[in-house]
């Protein structure tokens, strides 16, 4: 039990320190890291079930989907999470024809897209919350920390 309490306190200290020193940028980096690692774990679980998702490109597109709220404002306005998810479906549909057997094509596509919707698409909403800057500059940070605390406890 002491080990669990220690790890919880340590994780909260890391979160608070990152948010305090790096503000929203640090939070976005943490969220992206958690998103990619969670998606990796999801794909490993699917592989253990006997299916073959497109894990590498799925992780790359998953990181882009998580960062989509930032990409919309800094890179191009069409790089929304929805358009990246549609692009992922097209890329996987093209790759599936040449790389998978006809017997397991649907499963590969379904599990890969399910992972993208289940993990990074949902995490991008937390990035959106972090980017809220009104009525106070730290509104998004406070809301994100509150959301993490409520879901943790």
Which residues does each predicted region cover?
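Membrane-embedded alpha-helical bundles of polytopic integral membrane proteins
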Residues: 1-153
